[in-house]
Amino acid sequence: MQAVQREIAEQLNVQPPFADDQALEAEVARRISFIQDCLTSSGLKTLVLGISGGVDSLTAGLLAQRAMRELRERTGDEAYKFIAVRLPYDVQFDEHDAQASVDFIAPDERHTVNIGPAVKSLASEVAAFEGKHAVSVDFVLGNTKARMRMVAQYTIAGATHGLVIGTDHAAEAVMGFFTKFGDGACDLAPLSGLVKNQVRAIARSFGAPESLVEKVPTADLEDLSPGKPDEASHGVTYAEIDAFLHGEPVRQEAFDIIVNTYKKTHHKRVMPFAP
């Protein structure tokens, strides 16, 4: 492990690989307890999470639903609920995967909020500030979608006395692969410190369908590139990112991309700059 790998792994609190199934089960239990502690210490009763159809929200949703079920069993308080929210931008190209994820999670409540009208309304109001190139306009619109999804989740959480769950994990955090104040905003992040293959392993431990566990990850924020794979945006694979974070050797080009991207996206992982 090179010094910079160790430094980055420590800053992101990267967890070691699961040694065996027992270690995986212990980590699942620890993260469920974390979710329960966050909620009970807040005095609130619900958890809210947007379900996209990807493995990250699937895994976070499975942890949240089990946490709520155990809290109800332990306390007898039926007010503890997990609310799963679908947040499509009009029609989502992989809606069948999103619905399959919600079905497998079996949340206490499920709702759908179409963010399309709100995003388009805002875009029309600020059109004078947009760039001249379609690609840059599409990129900005993608970030607006992510932020509108979080606005919706916090609105629901506020109305139901709840907390919002985030899906950030170490393999995305190191690349700054999230929208500031969009999917990067949340009250608790139960996947924090995990690499991508650990997120998948946890989903498998719940018996999740392999089609969802191994689905090609995509943020799906850009209209001009629907379903664009995360790895195409990264320039490296998640396997390489995972290996880097666990101190394993990776090809030099991948090493340089990860380190340089980590440095460039530093501002996304810290509190606002202040004098």
UniProtKB/Swiss-Prot annotation:
EC category name: ligase
Catalytic activities: deamido-NAD(+) + NH4(+) + ATP = AMP + diphosphate + NAD(+) + H(+)
Annotated binding of Mg(2+), by residue: D56, E172
GO MF entries: ATP binding; glutaminase activity; metal ion binding; NAD+ synthase (glutamine-hydrolyzing) activity; NAD+ synthase activity
EC number(s) reported in the record: 6.3.1.5
Ranges in a coiled coil: none
InterPro entries (alphabetical): NAD/GMP_synthase (IPR022310), NAD_synthase (IPR003694), NH(3)-dep_NAD(+)_synth (IPR022926), Rossmann-like_a/b/a_fold (IPR014729)
Cellular component GO terms held in the UniProt record: cytoplasm
Residues that, per the record, bind ATP: G50, I51, S52, G53, G54, V55, D56, S57, T167, K196, T218
GO process terms (BP): NAD biosynthetic process
Pathway assigned in UniProt: Cofactor biosynthesis; NAD(+) biosynthesis; NAD(+) from deamido-NAD(+) (ammonia route): step 1/1
Residues reported to bind deamido-NAD(+): R147, K180, D187, H267, K268
Pfam families registered for this protein in UniProt: NAD_synthase
PANTHER family, alphabetized: NH 3 /GLUTAMINE-DEPENDENT NAD + SYNTHETASE, NH(3)-DEPENDENT NAD(+) SYNTHETASE
Functional description taken from the UniProt entry: Catalyzes the ATP-dependent amidation of deamido-NAD to form NAD. Uses ammonia as a nitrogen source.
Subunit (UniProt): Homodimer.
Family under the similarity heading: Belongs to the NAD synthetase family.
Protein name, entry field: NH(3)-dependent NAD(+) synthetase
Species this chain originates from: Pseudomonas fluorescens (strain Pf0-1)
Taxonomic lineage: Bacteria, Pseudomonadati, Pseudomonadota, Gammaproteobacteria, Pseudomonadales
